[in-house]
């Protein structure tokens, strides 16, 4: 087993947390700042469920769960879900929405590194969606996710590629032209090239299984999963068997 990196200081960017705390009350507003997350959630959920062989009866961890959009939808599929986030306001919104929806999700305010120290190899599926580009040390998050999943389990990451097209689409287009997300949501310097993410994965017990792009068509106002990872992309990995 390869040595895996562990952070000493909490792997938290408080400015990033503050961005999401400021708009947390509108997390479940289908026409608000998080409309794109609601729009792409069925695609994410379908990809995760299909690549995992279904979610029913599985123990799932959603890292960087925010207000709980993906976490709740996985719980609706019959999974036992834990949602992890360091933002107090988004977690409070998530807890209240789950209560109103009658959906059972265990929400915890804790870093993924802290959670991995307490719960190694506890989860069948670990998801980490659009979170890596919001922390100081994304490599540490990848290593922690690898420690959390059971041997043979599934780990999913999604993030944004770092190149000129991604800057135009995810920052200029999404934040300033289309106004799909609040200005300042993304910092292109924190975007992650697929080769970088795969190199971190290779340092762990995880093995790449599949990578796919998430594409937006402004003419039809639709999202789809398809080949091409030059902007948004999702990575499916599995943990090696003991």
Swiss-Prot record:
Keywords: Methyltransferase, S-adenosyl-L-methionine, Transferase, Ubiquinone biosynthesis. It catalyses: a 3-demethylubiquinol + S-adenosyl-L-methionine = a ubiquinol + S-adenosyl-L-homocysteine + H(+); a 3-(all-trans-polyprenyl)benzene-1,2-diol + S-adenosyl-L-methionine = a 2-methoxy-6-(all-trans-polyprenyl)phenol + S-adenosyl-L-homocysteine + H(+). Gene3D superfamilies: Vaccinia Virus protein VP39. It comes from the Bacteria. Pathway: Cofactor biosynthesis; ubiquinone biosynthesis. O-methyltransferase that catalyzes the 2 O-methylation steps in the ubiquinone biosynthetic pathway. Belongs to the methyltransferase superfamily. UbiG/COQ3 family. This is Ubiquinone biosynthesis O-methyltransferase. It comes from Klebsiella pneumoniae (strain 342). The lineage of its organism: Bacteria, Pseudomonadati, Pseudomonadota, Gammaproteobacteria, Enterobacterales. The gene is ubiG.
């Amino acid at each position: 087993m390869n040595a895996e990196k562990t952070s000493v200081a909490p792997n938290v960017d408080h400015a990033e947390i503050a961005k999401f705390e400021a708009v947390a009350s509108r997390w479940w507003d289908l026409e608000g700042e998080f409309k794109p997350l609601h729009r792409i959630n069925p695609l994410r959920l379908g990809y995760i469920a299909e690549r995992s062989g279904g979610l029913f009866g599985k123990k799932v961890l959603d890292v960087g769960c925010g207000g709980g959009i993906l976490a709740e939808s996985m719980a609706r599929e019959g999974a036992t879900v834990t949602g992890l986030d360091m933002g107090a306001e988004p977690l409070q919104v998530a807890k209240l929405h789950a209560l109103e929806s009658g959906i059972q999700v265990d929400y915890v305010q804790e870093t993924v590194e802290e959670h991995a120290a307490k719960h190694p190899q506890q989860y069948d599926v670990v998801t980490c969606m659009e979170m890596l580009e919001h922390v100081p040390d994304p490599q540490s998050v990848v290593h922690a996710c690898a420690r959390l999943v059971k041997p043979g389990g599934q780990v999913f990451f999604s993030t944004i590629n770092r190149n000129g097209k991604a800057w135009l689409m995810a920052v200029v287009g999404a934040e300033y032209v289309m106004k799909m997300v609040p200005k300042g949501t993304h910092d292109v310097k924190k975007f992650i090239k697929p080769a970088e993410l795969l190199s971190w994965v290779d340092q762990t017990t995880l093995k790449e299984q599949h990578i796919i792009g998430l594409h937006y068509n402004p003419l039809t106002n639709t999202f789809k999963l398809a080949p091409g990872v030059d902007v948004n992309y999702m990575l499916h990995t599995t943990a090696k068997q003991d």
